[in-house]
């Protein structure tokens, strides 16, 4: 039955859509998104993907319409605060913070304006798409202000005379700079997250959710890890291990042609920079290979 299938909401378009789909595919979920279809059925698992607007996803989870959802923490918290203020259901379970979709919600002001802290915003009119997050921050700071609610092109509000400042999502700051603005205050940091509805699941759905979570953990660990192979002086093994924090102890094998050295294989959770490789070389390591890992399960 259709209701027995796991229903996952993902953003139809936008910054999180491609990466959410890519993560599911890396977890072995086969599907094909075509055209304007709003529901996509997995080819190999009892999973349905619902392609919806990002600001609809928290509500679908909180109302129990879907089982799981990929959403930015900024959008999730904005909707939660809004629904809480309206007395609507706003509960969910955060299953896993993901390693993509990083951004921050920041207050930006005219690039030539002096800024000493939130108190400088007292009495200002601030344009934003996130009124609840802005209000929560300003209320906590004890700063009175007024909101100019916009659904897009927030950065042009000061030049258009609509507002004195803005509160908008920032990734690099290039858009702010192009519009004569500068970042003054970070009010919320966000990444993509996987959330789940409140309530019980039957055994099959619960098992499938746990399987997906285990695979997601493996995908994320693989991204953060490297498989390293090198030859090392046997007497310097402990010093070399200290440079390469690993998931487990390394595999150490004798070399047939050189009894003074051993072959070392390990998975390192540390980013391996050129400086680290140079330090390894100084310790006598040679034939150093650093390889990416596609999948990983401990």
UniProtKB/Swiss-Prot annotation:
One of its GO terms (cellular component) is cytoplasm. It catalyses: 1-(5-phospho-beta-D-ribosyl)-ATP + diphosphate = 5-phospho-alpha-D-ribose 1-diphosphate + ATP. Its cofactor is Mg(2+). Its EC number is 2.4.2.17. GO terms for biological process: L-histidine biosynthetic process. Feedback inhibited by histidine. Pathway: Amino-acid biosynthesis; L-histidine biosynthesis; L-histidine from 5-phospho-alpha-D-ribose 1-diphosphate: step 1/9. It holds the Pfam family HisG. GO terms for molecular function: ATP binding; ATP phosphoribosyltransferase activity; magnesium ion binding. Belongs to the ATP phosphoribosyltransferase family. Long subfamily. This is ATP phosphoribosyltransferase. It comes from Vibrio parahaemolyticus serotype O3:K6 (strain RIMD 2210633). The lineage of its organism: Bacteria, Pseudomonadati, Pseudomonadota, Gammaproteobacteria, Vibrionales.
């Amino acid at each position: 039955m259709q209701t027995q299938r796991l229903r996952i909401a993902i953003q139809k378009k936008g910054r999180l859509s491609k990466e959410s789909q890519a993560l599911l595919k890396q977890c072995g979920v086969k599907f094909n998104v075509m055209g304007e279809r709003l529901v996509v059925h997995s080819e190999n698992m009892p999973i349905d993907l619902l392609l919806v607007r990002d600001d609809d996803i928290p509500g679908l989870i909180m109302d129990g319409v879907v089982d799981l959802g990929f959403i930015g923490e900024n959008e999730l918290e904005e909707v939660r605060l809004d629904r809480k203020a309206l007395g609507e259901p706003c509960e969910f379970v955060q299953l896993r913070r993901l390693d993509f979709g990083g951004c921050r919600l920041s207050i930006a002001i005219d690039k030539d304006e002096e800024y000493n802290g939130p108190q400088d915003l007292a009495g200002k009119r601030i344009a934003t798409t996130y009124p609840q997050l802005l209000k929560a921050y300003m209320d906590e700071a004890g700063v009175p202000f007024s909101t100019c609610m916009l659904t897009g092109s927030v950065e042009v509000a000061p030049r258009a005379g609509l507002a004195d400042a803005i509160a908008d999502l920032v990734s690099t700051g290039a858009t702010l700079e192009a519009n004569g603005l500068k970042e003054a205050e970070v009010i919320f940091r966000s990444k993509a997250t996987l959330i789940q509805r409140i309530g019980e699941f039957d055994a099959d759905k619960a098992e499938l959710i746990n399987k997906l979570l285990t695979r997601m953990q493996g995908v994320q660990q693989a991204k953060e890890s490297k498989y390293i192979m090198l030859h090392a002086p046997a007497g310097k093994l402990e010093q070399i291990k200290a440079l390469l924090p690993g998931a487990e102890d390394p595999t150490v094998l004798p070399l047939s042609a050189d009894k003074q050295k051993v072959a070392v294989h390990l998975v390192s959770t540390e980013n391996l920079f050129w400086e680290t490789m140079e330090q390894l070389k100084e310790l006598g390591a040679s034939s150093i290979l650093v390889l990416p890992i596609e999948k990983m399960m401990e």
